[in-house]
Amino acid sequence: MAVKIRLKRMGAKRDPFYRIVVSDARSPRDGRFIEQIGYYDPLEEPARISVDEAKARVWLQQGAQMTETVRSLFKKSGVLERLGAERAEERG
């Protein structure tokens, strides 16, 4: 099963917020998901990003792929950098 970490749109018309979810790549954008690992609210100033880094790490170690948008959000919030540093420490 191909698994992706991606955004699921929630909220009202013209008032979106997004859940960061782990889902099967074949399921629809707003359809079924396996697990919610965070959220992103673009309308707040500054945009609010919250990620459960432990869950993200587990899914990435199991082979889940991030979409480009999620990758940029992780990079912006510093999550990607911390996950990379942990991985470098594990390698030695």
Swiss-Prot record:
A GO CC term assigned to this protein in UniProt: cytoplasm
GO biological process, one term: translation
Domain of life: Bacteria
InterPro entries: Ribosomal_bS16, Ribosomal_bS16_CS, Ribosomal_bS16_dom_sf
Keyword GTP-binding appears in the UniProt entry: no
Record keywords, A-Z: Ribonucleoprotein, Ribosomal protein
Alphabetized GO MF terms: structural constituent of ribosome
PANTHER family with a match to the protein in the record: 30S RIBOSOMAL PROTEIN S16, SMALL RIBOSOMAL SUBUNIT PROTEIN BS16M
Family note: Belongs to the bacterial ribosomal protein bS16 family.
HAMAP family, per database record: Ribosomal_bS16
Name recorded for this polypeptide: Small ribosomal subunit protein bS16
